[in-house]
């Protein structure tokens, strides 16, 4: 886990546990925050993969990532602006991937994935865009939202 913060009153909380899934191994989290009053919370449980990256530039941005049983589960959040919120919950996995890119201000992106081989891509620019992806059951689902 690598946390790099530049600015004032940024908060980063990373919890990585067990490393037991499939023989255990690899649970990474990279949090980079530049600006003021940004918050990032990453929770990764049983692992054998589980990589999460959070990049936040600006102020008052919030990123929450929960990856539970893993066997892959990749989350990448990039927020460049102010007052953006990104929430990712990936449970039970066997490969799930979420990529959220937000530029501008006051965006909200929420991704909930359960089941196998779920892929989610959300890209938001300008201001105040809202997107929610919920993928459960089945396998091989893909969702893309582009808001400009």
Residues of each region from the PLM?
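Low-complexity repeat regions of mature extracellularly deployed or surface/particle-associated proteins
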Residues: 1-148
């Amino acid at each position: 886990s690598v946390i790099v913060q530049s600015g004032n009153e940024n908060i980063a909380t990373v919890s990585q546990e067990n490393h037991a899934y499939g023989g255990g191994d690899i649970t990474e989290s990279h949090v980079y925050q530049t600006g003021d009053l940004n918050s990032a919370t990453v929770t990764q449980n049983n692992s054998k993969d589980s990589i999460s990256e959070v990049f936040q530039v600006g102020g008052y941005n919030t990123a929450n990532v929960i990856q539970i049983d893993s066997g892959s589960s990749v989350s990448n959040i990039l927020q460049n602006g102010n007052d953006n919120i990104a929430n990712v919950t990936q449970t039970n996995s066997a490969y799930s991937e979420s990529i959220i890119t937000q530029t501008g201000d006051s965006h909200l992106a929420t991704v909930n994935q359960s089941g196998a081989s779920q892929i989610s891509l959300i890209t938001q620019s300008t201001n105040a865009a809202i997107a929610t992806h919920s993928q459960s059951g089945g396998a091989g689902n893909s969702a893309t939202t582009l808001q400009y």
